Each structure stands twice: as C-alpha cells, then as structure tokens.
C-alpha cells in the first residue's frame, strides 16, 4: 500500500478487516497468554488510523471466531488500553489533494461519536485516552502518504 485511506475510514475498514484472516493475526492469537495485555495507538482524524483501531479491536474481541487459534479465549478477554491521537499538525492547502485541513475537525468529531457508541459504549476497551495539540503552527507539505510521509 503506497498511501493510506486519505480520510476515508469506510474504505479502510473493508481493507483492514482482512487482517483477521492473516497468518500474522493467527500467530498473534496463538502466542497470546492469559496475563498478556494489549495497548493500541492510533490516529482518529484521517482514514487509516480511524479505520484500523475499531477493526483491530473488533477482531480481537471476536477472537473465538478465529480458526486454528489456541488462545483465542485469552485474546477475547484481554485487558485492552488505547491512545487515540487527535489532530496535532497543520498542512499546506492544496486543492488537488484528497487531504484537507478543513476536514480534520469534522472527521474527528464523527469518529468520536462512532467511538462513543461502538468502542467505549460497549466496553470493548478497558481504558481509552486521547492526546492532541493545537495544530495551527507551521504547515507541513500536503502529502497523502506516498512520498513525504516516508521521510
């Protein structure tokens, strides 16, 4: 994948949901012990992080549905904490870019409502923290991820 989901978590959720069928996730489920804990860090105002966090969490809590995974009960009942990063930087305006600074707050607000109903509201996490900063400072180049974000 050259770029993320450029502010479209609905697309990201379809793609990232395939992770539950991967060998890596099955290996993780098999290696998970009863005393293990999980801590997930994600962003909330774009597409990839906003989609990835709920999907990963859902797949962990639905671990009994993973075939050939021995420790899926431990995984399903694991204590999970998370840190979600709110908008914290400024980007240059570029009308041709799919990423627009003016959309950050609206996308964050929509994601927060979704998280309230589908993550904290149903006790999928034991603790959820938010961190962010005033993002009005110097503007970074507007890059959807295939060039500048890899520096």
State each model region's role.
Residues 1-151:
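Tubulin/FtsZ superfamily GTPase core signature
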